[in-house]
C-alpha cells in the first residue's frame, strides 16, 4: 500500500468501500506502523504490554490495509482503538519519503473509525493538512537533547491525562519537536503546551472522528513516555481494554535481628562485630514511616515489609519500646512495634539454600515461623524470602567464592530439596530477583511458575543500588563511586556523584518502575535503616525521594500491599496473560452499554472500563477481574471514558 508522499491541497475524503455501520467492537487495539524499525511501534507495544492489553501490529509498508483487516466476517469491528506511530505513516526508502497507506487505505481506515465510533491516537504528528488536517500550524521545529523542556497540561489535557496532576511539569528530553499553534476556526483543542506553543492536540475531523496526537517524538525509555502514552491508549480505547495500570511502591527490609557486614568510607569491610539494628533505630524507623505518610498523602497506606531471621531473637525480652535502646533492646522494641510493620519469613539462620538437605531447608523455614510466632510476629506461611535469593538456580559454582558474580543456571538449577520442603510447609511464593534473568516473568506483574514445582511461583523483587552493608551517606557515596564512578569497577559516570545526586538518580530509576505499573517490591537491608543523624536513614531518604518524584507528576494514589496481596495479584496477572494467549474475546456493544466476554479456555482476566462483581476503582479507572468458564459468555456493564 505504499505511495509516494505528495501533499494535495485538501485531504482525500472520497467515499470508500468500507465497513457498514455497526455497534460492536472487540476490546483490542491496532498499532499501525511503517515497519519493524518504526520507533513508535516499540513505544506503543511497551505500554500495551505493561497494561496487559490485547493488540495487533500492522506494518503498512508491506501489508495492505483492507476492510477485512478491520471488520470480522460477522460484522463485529476487530479494534476499539487505532494507534498510529505517526499521523502520516511516512518512512524513507531509497532517498524518497513514502506513506505506508495509499489514499484508498486511508479512506478505509477513516470510514471504519467513523462507522464504528473508534478513536485514533497518533504518537507523533506534524503541522499541515496531509493526509488529513489536525488543525496545526507551524511555529517552528527544534531538537531537544538531555536538557529538558517542560510540558504543561491544558484544561483539556488535564482531562485526557487525569491520572496526572493538572500542574505537572513533564520533562521532555531526547526528542524532535514540532512547535505549533491551533489553526483558527478549526475543530481542535490543545492538550499539551510548552510556553505558547502547542505540543499536543485533541481534534475532531470534519466527518466527526475523534483524534489525539503529540507533536514530539517519544520512545519507551523516556519519562515523558511513561507519563503520557498510557493516557493516549486509554483515551483511544475510551478506557475499555484488557488489563490495567496502577502504581505501587512496596519495600522490603531484609535480615531483621541478624548481623550485617559493614562497609566504611575508606573501603574496608568490617565483618565482626558488623552492624546490628538497635531499639532506637526501630523506634526511629516507625517515626520516619509515619512522617512519610504525613508528608506524602498519596501514599497514606504505605507500610514497610520486614524479612526477619529469628535465630537472634531474645526469647526472654519484654515488650517495651526503648527510644534510646541499643542492640539488646531490639527484640523488646520490635515486639512493642510489631503491628507497625509487616513480617516476612527469611529463614532462621540465613544460610544459603543452594545445596541444603530437605531436613535443613524444612527446619530453617518452620523454625523461623515458630520463632516469629513466639514474639507475636505474624508472617504469611505462603511467602518465603530465601537468603540472597538462594536455592533458586543462581549461585557461584565455587561455594567458597563470595565475591565473583553468581552464575544463573536457570530455575531448573534450583535446590529440589528446598522446593520439596517449601511445598510441604504450604509455601506458595518464593521471592526472586529481577537481576536474574531466569527469575523475570515473561509479563509485567506476573509470577513465574516454578518448572520443578508448579505449586510454587517465583515473584521477583527489584534490587537497589543502596548497598546492603552501608549505613550512612558517606558509606553509600564511597561504595557507589567505587562501583560506578570514573575509576570504579563498572565506570558509568564521568565524575563521582554526591550522596544527593545518587539518591536523586536511584529514585529516578525507581520512579521508572513505579510509572510502569510494576507491583514488585524493592529490597533494602538492615544497615540502611540506621539513624545516621537527626532521625534520617538511607532507606527513608530513598523512599522520600521516590514519593516526591511520584507526587510531582501523579494525582492517583501510590498503592502499597502486604505480601499475600501482592503475591495473589501476580497470580491473577499470570492467569490474565494466559487468557490473552488463549484468545479471550471481549466485545463492546455501544447500543446496550455492555461488554460480553468469551474465551476458549477457563481462567481469569482483568478488564478496564468494566463494572462487574468485585470491581475496583483507581482514580477514574474501573477494573473488573472476571472468572471465565470455557466457551461461556459473561456480560458486564461498560464504563467508558468519554
Which residues fall in each region the model found?
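An acidic-aromatic substrate-binding cleft motif
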Residues: 216-310, 339-349
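An acidic, glycine-rich "communication" segment
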Residues: 8, 12-16, 118-195
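C-terminal beta-strand-rich structural cap/linker in extracellular carbohydrate-active enzymes
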Residues: 620-642
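A glycine-centered loop/beta-turn motif at secondary-structure junctions
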Residues: 46-50, 78-79, 116-119, 157-159, ...
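Carbohydrate-binding surface patches
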Residues: 583-617
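Catalytic grooves of carbohydrate-active enzymes
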Residues: 217-219, 233-262, 373-375, 463-560
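Helical hinge/lid and interdomain linker segments adjacent to catalytic or ligand-binding clefts
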Residues: 30-122, 128-130
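Metal-dependent polysaccharide deacetylase catalytic core of the NodB/CE4 family, i.e.
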Residues: 25-28, 107-108, 113-116, 123-134, ...
Amino acid at each position: 500500500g505504499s505511495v509516494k508522499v505528495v501533499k494535495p491541497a485538501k485531504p482525500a475524503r472520497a467515499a470508500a468501500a468500507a465497513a457498514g455501520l455497526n455497534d460492536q467492537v472487540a476490546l483490542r487495539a491496532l498499532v499501525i506502523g511503517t515497519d519493524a524499525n518504526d520507533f513508535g511501534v516499540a513505544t506503543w507495544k511497551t505500554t500495551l504490554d505493561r497494561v496487559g492489553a490485547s493488540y495487533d501490529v500492522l506494518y503498512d509498508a508491506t501489508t495492505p490495509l483492507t476492510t477485512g483487516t478491520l471488520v470480522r466476517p460477522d460484522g463485529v469491528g476487530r479494534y476499539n482503538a487505532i494507534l498510529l506511530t505517526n499521523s502520516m505513516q511516512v518512512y524513507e526508502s531509497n532517498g524518497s519519503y513514502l506513506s505506508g497507506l495509499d489514499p484508498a487505505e486511508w479512506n478505509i481506515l477513516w470510514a471504519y473509525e467513523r462507522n464504528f465510533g473508534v478513536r485514533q491516537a497518533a504518537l507523533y504528528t506534524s503541522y499541515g493538512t496531509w493526509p488529513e488536517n489536525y488543525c496545526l500550524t507551524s511555529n517552528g521545529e527544534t531538537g531537544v537533547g538531555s536538557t529538558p523542556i517542560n510540558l504543561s497540561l491544558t484544561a483539556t489535557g488535564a482531562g485526557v491525562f487525569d491520572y496526572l496532576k493538572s500542574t505537572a511539569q513533564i520533562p521532555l528530553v531526547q526528542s524532535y519537536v514540532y512547535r505549533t499553534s491551533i489553526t483558527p476556526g478549526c475543530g481542535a483543542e490543545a492538550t499539551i503546551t510548552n510556553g505558547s506553543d502547542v505540543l499536543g492536540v485533541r481534534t475532531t475531523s470534519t466527518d466527526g472522528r475523534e483524534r489525539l496526537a503529540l507533536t514530539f517524538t517519544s520512545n519507551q525509555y523516556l519519562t515523558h513516555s511513561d507519563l503520557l502514552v498510557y493516557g493516549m491508549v486509554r483515551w483511544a480505547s475510551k478506557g475499555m481494554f484488557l488489563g490495567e495500570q496502577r502504581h505501587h511502591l512496596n519495600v522490603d527490609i531484609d535480615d531483621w535481628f541478624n548481623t550485617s557486614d559493614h562497609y566504611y568510607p575508606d573501603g574496608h569491610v568490617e565483618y565482626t562485630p558488623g552492624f546490628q539494628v538497635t531499639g532506637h533505630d526501630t523506634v526511629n524507623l516507625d517515626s520516619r514511616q509515619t512522617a512519610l505518610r504525613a508528608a506524602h498523602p498519596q501514599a497514606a497506606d504505605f507500610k514497610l515489609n520486614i524479612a526477619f531471621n529469628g535465630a537472634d531473637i531474645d526469647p526472654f525480652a519484654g515488650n517495651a519500646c526503648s527510644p534510646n535502646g541499643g542492640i539488646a533492646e531490639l527484640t523488646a522494641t520490635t515486639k512493642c512495634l510489631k503491628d507497625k510493620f509487616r513480617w516476612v519469613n527469611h529463614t532462621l539462620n540465613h544460610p544459603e539454600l543452594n545445596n541444603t538437605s530437605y531436613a535443613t531447608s524444612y527446619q530453617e523455614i518452620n523454625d523461623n515461623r515458630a520463632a516469629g510466632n513466639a514474639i507475636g510476629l505474624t508472617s504469611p506461611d505462603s511467602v518465603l524470602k530465601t537468603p540472597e535469593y538462594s536455592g533458586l538456580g543462581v549461585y557461584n559454582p565455587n561455594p567458597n567464592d563470595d565475591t565473583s558474580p553468581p552464575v544463573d543456571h536457570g530455575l531448573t538449577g534450583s535446590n529440589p530439596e528446598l522446593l520439596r520442603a517449601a511445598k510441604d510447609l504450604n509455601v506458595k511464593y518464593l521471592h526472586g530477583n529481577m537481576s536474574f534473568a531466569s527469575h523475570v516473568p515473561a509479563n509485567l506483574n506476573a509470577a513465574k511458575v516454578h518448572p520443578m514445582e508448579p505449586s510454587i511461583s517465583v515473584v521477583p523483587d527489584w534490587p537497589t543500588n543502596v548497598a546492603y552493608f552501608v549505613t550512612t551517606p558517606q558509606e553509600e557515596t564511597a561504595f557507589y563511586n567505587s562501583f560506578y564512578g570514573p575509576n570504579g569497577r563498572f565506570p558509568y559516570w564521568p565524575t563521582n556523584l554526591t550522596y544527593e545526586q545518587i539518591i536523586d538518580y536511584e529514585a529516578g530509576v525507581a520512579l521508572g518502575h513505579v510509572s510502569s505499573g510494576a507491583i514488585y517490591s524493592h529490597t533494602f537491608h538492615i544497615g540502611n535503616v540506621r539513624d545516621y543523624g537527626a532521625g534520617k536513614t538511607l532507606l527513608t531518604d530513598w523512599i522520600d525521594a521516590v514519593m516526591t518524584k511520584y507526587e510531582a507528576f501523579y494525582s492517583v494514589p501510590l498503592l502499597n500491599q502486604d505480601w499475600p496481596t501482592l503475591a495473589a495479584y501476580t497470580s491473577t496477572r499470570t492467569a490474565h496473560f494466559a487468557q490473552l494467549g488463549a484468545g479471550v474475546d471481549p466485545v463492546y456493544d455501544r447500543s446496550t452499554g455492555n461488554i460480553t466476554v468469551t474465551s476458549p479456555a477457563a481462567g481469569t482476566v482483568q478488564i478496564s472500563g468494566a463494572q462487574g462483581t468485585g470491581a475496583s476503582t483507581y482514580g477514574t479507572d474501573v477494573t473488573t477481574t472476571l472468572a471465565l468458564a470455557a466457551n461461556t459468555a459473561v456480560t458486564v456493564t461498560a464504563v467508558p471514558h468519554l
